[in-house]
Swiss-Prot record:
Keyword line: Chromosome, DNA-binding, Glycoprotein, Isopeptide bond, Nucleosome core, Nucleus, Phosphoprotein, Ubl conjugation
Top-level taxonomy: Eukaryota, Metazoa, Echinodermata, Eleutherozoa, Echinozoa
Spans annotated as Disordered: 1-43
Protein name: Histone H2B.1, sperm
Entry annotated with the keyword Endoplasmic reticulum: no
Keyword Phosphoprotein included in the entry's annotation: yes
Recorded family membership: Belongs to the histone H2B family.
Biased composition (Basic residues): 7-43
Amino acid sequence: MPSQKSPTKRSPTKRSPQKGGKGAKRGGKAGKRRRGVAVKRRRRRRESYGIYIYKVLKQVHPDTGISSRAMSVMNSFVNDVFERIASEAGRLTTYNRRNTVSSREVQTAVRLLLPGELAKHAVSEGTKAVTKYTTSR
């Protein structure tokens, strides 16, 4: 009869959590201790275009609301368009052997990325915003 090893029960070994590894434990709400007193950790702020999207919505449709899911979609959309315009403007700056992204590059990027009438409206609104900013300074 072949000798079979019976499975031995192993007691779980206590390991100290490693910094940044899988076993690292997350700090609770109490956070760090200073002089024996628990100090609450401040939550990191989440940046969003939510308030601006809401303001524009109220300008266009004052009696309409927006769900948090729809707000999340709109926020993602604005972030995506911003990233596209910024990267295209950066590319144009590199092509023209410049170091600074100016309003001209941003305007050209908008013309390249947005179709027809939408680009015209975006350029006119952008120009209006830049003029308002320069006159207020």
